[in-house]
Amino acid sequence: VDLRSDTVTRPTPEMREAMAEAEVGDDVYMDDPTVNKLQEKSAQMFDKEDSLFVPSGTMGNLLALLVHCQRGDEVIVGDKSHIYMNEAGGMSALGGIQPHPVKNQADGTLLLDDILASIQAEDVHHTITRLICLENTQNVCGGVPLSLEYTRAVGKTARENNLSLHIDGARIFNAATALNVSVKELVEPSDSVMFCLSKGLAAPVGSMLVGSKKFITRARHLRKMLGG
């Protein structure tokens, strides 16, 4: 048993057989029937309008930030979040986006008061806050799930302040199972979600990004720009 990470999970024999026999096509031309079915199913499961397959969770998160933010904008993130700690500074290096780290509590949450205090006032001297990012489950804090009630509260805060909410849901199915809720309920307050296929779901590679049709159309263009 390898307990380093769930990233070392491997496809089952049944999964390998399904891959070998899968219908294939060109995803860039959007005529790969298997990828299309995967994207349709992902959007349906998360009750969002559209979905996009990406090579990695890191790319999925970066695409979300690039769609939600313009260069020079600011995003509120947890100081122990994967986006802030473990994604090679992509938001800044490739997007010109400034992170505003907020302390993660032991239960993985960001205090609502801390989020509110981090939202920049309208002022020519300040960056413009565009986005709040949550991570569910929160990996560094022990894999704890963020509750539906908490996620709804953050979503309400985002809407009241004209911000978007992105969820790094690399392990969102773990959270849904632990909380005994559906993933679509758990992500309902969000504008976009990334979830991984290559962790507990045991696929060899890949992640999904879900959101509105307009969001995914822009993300598809940016995926090509990033080489995906």
Model-derived regions, located:
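Conserved PLP-enzyme active-site core in the AAT-like
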Residues: D2-G228
